[in-house]
Swiss-Prot record:
Keyword Lipid metabolism included in the entry's annotation: no
Residues where substrate binds: R286, W293, D294, N330, R339, S340, Q341, E406, R455, G458
Organism: Neurospora crassa (strain ATCC 24698 / 74-OR23-1A / CBS 708.71 / DSM 1257 / FGSC 987)
Main location: cytoplasm
Record's protein name: Cytosolic neutral trehalase
Pfam short name (any one): Trehalase_Ca-bi
GO cellular component: alpha,alpha-trehalose-phosphate synthase complex (UDP-forming)
EC number(s) on file: 3.2.1.28
Keyword terms of this UniProt record: Calcium, Cytoplasm, Glycosidase, Hydrolase, Metal-binding
Pathway assigned to this chain's UniProt record: Carbohydrate degradation
Induction: Induced during recovery from thermal stress.
InterPro entries in alphabetical order: 6-hairpin_glycosidase_sf (IPR008928), 6hp_glycosidase-like_sf (IPR012341), Glyco_hydro_37 (IPR001661), Glyco_hydro_37_CS (IPR018232), Trehalase_Ca-bd (IPR011120)
Active-site residues, as the UniProt record annotates them: D460 (proton donor/acceptor), E665 (proton donor/acceptor)
Protein's UniProt keywords contain Transmembrane helix: no
């Protein structure tokens, strides 16, 4: 960008927006002192100077700026307009006038006049200009909150920040603010907050961290932190060597954070070597632990935004987890030690490697990541209990005992109460006895086995999985494993000269198929076998889509899910199957705002006794959109991919414009007006902010910047003007017909 002009030669010419860096991130924008002095106004004799204007307000004790009649600026001027603003009085005026429902946001649901007059910098505050409409006023609210946060009492604000193209604004916020707001690292700088657990229901909740035996340097590091800062009450524990369901259950009395990867650095203050946590991105602002498949989706957005360092760091954290905990965990808390999440490590690794392959250490990064993925494949997904030996397909089927510990026992009171009465015990007595095997209830065992499987699937919750999840060979999981097999085969063949040695410390000892020397042929054969099994058990020719297969009943299920498109993402479908899905499945699953999680018919009727589930109709989720777009593009269905991406991006942008910059975890893709409103369990993450959103939601942020790579330039311009897809396509068709008619 061009630096700010000096007070000499450049004063008289028209200045572009870029020359004033008006789209700088908030920290730069509001902490650059020179920006907020009014160099641009020429001398005037009949007006306030900037300082005297503000001082006069203070002398008069005014909380609102005095209004001057007949001194409005023209609506158009040759250069970008700027405003002289007193932050606190303007913020109070704005909120009292426009935030009529008092939720510290300005939305289309507020019924204020939707106009506020601001003093212009070009007139030294003498003239005013009206800011109109929900979008500009809500942007003003957000900018004032940010200015206040950075300690500014008065600012010169560029109008361009208020009427910025919403696609550009949201993209900029994601890149400059949201990723930063969602980035965490686990070390002394953050352990007090990160190690505290809102799901710690014990009598003495305190920060606690578990260190694997293979990382003694981390145990030494955190022990020193605990000794140096006794006020933290930090409990540093070694993790047991062998992790079993019984050990995990007993650890629930002392739940804690699990250590992730650290790097050796030199402390700039002392000059001594120390450890620093490798950073990672969390799903939402209230989280502090590393999550599983959220991290993959986030990495796609990070790579678009050139945050390769963060995406690489997250891969390294995953490798640490596989090496020391045996798997990529649902999240890095002790009660998740038996549970994984949908596996995406090979694709994540290869995307990062493609960005860094010319850097020193890139090949070693790829080697370590491949070792981790191979170990995870053997020890988690193709071993008991997740492998179904009959079909050769895999299931979400984590080990575990008793009631899932991250939920309050009361969450399952309707399930457990009858059993407590049956055994003539109090609720708490029964839960303890059942969890510790003192009472045997096979029906409850099955219920919680399926409940754990739903949570491992990442699709918690949905009627697709209720009461059967652990028995299902799903199209989503088996597509991901097919992708592992083809990725590993290709990488061994093309990068490691078709011989890949596995050292003893990376060998999966619980699976006889694991080898010390891996070749591409071994993995090619696995991929072919899995494709044959997927075609036999999961593909439905008549329906033109994939369904889950119940390994207990030996029958194909009939729930129509957007995960059918994961097969396109993984490359498991043949061209005929891909075309059938576009013809038959896509019309059933496409809605106003993109892809539905499932069809209305598959969900069934809902009511008081059968409430909405968040992974069912009418909700849409970022991962389903991303994988479908990528898969459709892979098979040449570019127009369909662009259409779905446009609808999703339009819905997010419209909610962002109408509802004070909101970006949430999931959307009701059937609602044109307020799709961020979700009436299902768990509510919606990303709604609860005051004034300005700081984080958005991880995988939705990623879907936005990734989706903008899918749509074409014409579509992006139309999104910036909030043009609905049908209106856009009608205009495109009219232009096309006009162009055809003009051809000779």
């Amino acid at each position: 960008m061009t630096s700010q002009p000096s007070s000499g030669k450049g004063r008289g010419r028209n200045l572009s927006i870029d020359e004033y860096n008006v789209y700088d991130d908030a920290k730069t924008y509001y902490t650059t002192e020179d920006r907020h002095h009014n160099h641009r106004a020429g001398a005037r004799t009949r007006t306030y100077s900037q300082n005297s204007l503000f001082k006069q307000f203070e002398r008069l004790g005014l909380q609102k700026e005095p209004y001057r009649r007949g001194s409005h600026d023209e609506s158009t001027i040759p250069q970008s307009r700027r405003f002289l603003i007193q932050v606190e009085p303007t913020l109070q005026s704005l909120q009292s006038q426009e935030d009529t429902d008092g939720n510290m946001q300005i939305t289309i649901e507020d019924n204020g006049p939707k106009v506020l007059s601001l003093r212009t910098a070009a007139s030294n505050g003498y003239n005013r200009f009206d800011i109109r409409g929900t979008y500009m006023l809500s942007n003003l609210l957000q900018e004032l909150y940010l200015a206040k946060e950075y300690g500014r009492k008065q600012i010169i604000l560029d109008e361009a920040r208020l009427n910025e193209n919403p696609v550009n604004r949201l993209s900029r916020l994601i890149k400059d603010h949201f990723w930063e707001g969602l980035t965490r690292r686990i070390d002394a700088s953050s352990i007090e907050i990160a190690a505290r657990d809102p799901k710690d229901w014990t009598d003495d909740p305190r920060p606690r961290i578990y260190i694997p035996r293979g990382a003694p340097e981390q145990h030494e590091y955190y022990t020193k932190v605990a000794l140096d800062r006794p006020e933290l009450r930090l409990d540093v524990q070694y993790l047991p060597e062998k992790i079993t369901p019984e050990i995990v259950r007993d650890m629930n009395a002392k739940p804690g954070l699990l250590a992730v990867d650290m790097e050796e650095v030199v402390d700039p203050k002392t000059g001594e070597k120390t450890l620093r946590g490798r950073p990672f991105v969390v799903p939402g602002g209230r989280f502090n632990e590393l999550y599983g498949w959220d991290s993959y989706m986030e990495s796609l957005g990070l790579l678009v935004n050139d945050r390769v360092d963060l995406a690489k760091s997250m891969v390294q954290n995953f490798c640490f987890c596989i090496k020391h905990y045996g798997k990529i965990l649902n999240a890095t808390r002790s009660y998740y030690l038996c549970r994984s999440q949908p596996p995406f490590l090979t694709d994540m690794t290869l995307r990062v490697y493609d960005k860094i392959k010319h850097e020193p250490g890139a090949l070693e990064f790829l080697r370590q990541s491949l070792l981790a993925a191979i170990k995870e494949y053997y020890s988690v997904w193709t071993a008991e209990p997740r492998l179904d030996p009959v079909t050769g397909l895999s299931r979400y089927r984590p080990e575990g005992l008793g009631v899932p510990p991250e939920t309050e026992a009361g969450h399952f009171i309707h399930i457990l109460e009858p059993y407590a009465k049956k055994h003539n015990m109090s609720f708490d007595e029964f839960v303890y006895a059942y969890n510790h095997g003192e009472i045997k209830e096979p029906t409850l065992d099955d219920y919680f086995m399926h409940d754990r499987a739903v949570r491992e699937s990442g699709h918690d919750t949905t009627y697709r999985f209720e009461g059967i999840c652990a028995d299902l060979a799903t199209i989503d999981l088996n597509s991901l494993l097919f992708k592992y097999e083809t990725d590993i085969a290709r990488t061994i063949r093309n990068v490691f000269h078709d011989k890949f040695e596995v050292p003893d410390d990376w060998l999966a000892t619980n699976n006889p198929a694991a080898s010390k020397l891996e070749t591409s042929a071994m993995w090619d054969r696995r991929a072919k076998r899995r494709k044959l099994a997927i075609d036999k058990y999961l593909w439905n020719e008549e329906a033109g889509m994939y369904f889950d297969y119940n390994t207990a009943t030996r029958k194909q299920c009939n729930y129509e899910s957007a995960t059918t498109f994961w097969a396109l993402w993984a490359g498991v479908s043949n061209p005929k199957q891909a075309a059938a899905m576009v013809t038959k499945a896509l019309p059933k699953l496409e809605a106003f705002g993109g892809l539905l999680s499932g069809t209305k018919e598959s969900r069934g009727e809902i009511g008081l006794e059968r409430p909405n589930r968040q992974w069912d109709y009418p909700y849409g989720w970022a991962p389903q959109q991303i994988l479908a777009w990528t898969g459709l593009y892979r098979y040449g269905f570019n127009e369909e991919a662009e259409r779905l991406a446009y609808k999703w991006l339009f819905m997010i942008t419209k909610a962002f414009v109408d509802f004070n910059g909101v970006v949430v975890e999931k959307y009701d893709v059937t609602r044109p007006i307020d799709p961020h409103r979700v009436d299902a369990e768990y509510g919606n993450q990303g709604l609860d902010f005051k004034g300005v959103a700081k984080e958005g939601f991880g995988w939705v942020n990623a879907s936005y910047v990734y989706g903008l790579q899918i749509v074409n330039a014409h579509m992006r311009r139309a999104l910036g003007t909030l043009t609905p897809y049908e209106t856009f396509m009608k205009a495109v068709e009219e232009n096309r017909n006009k162009a055809l008619s003009e051809l000779v």
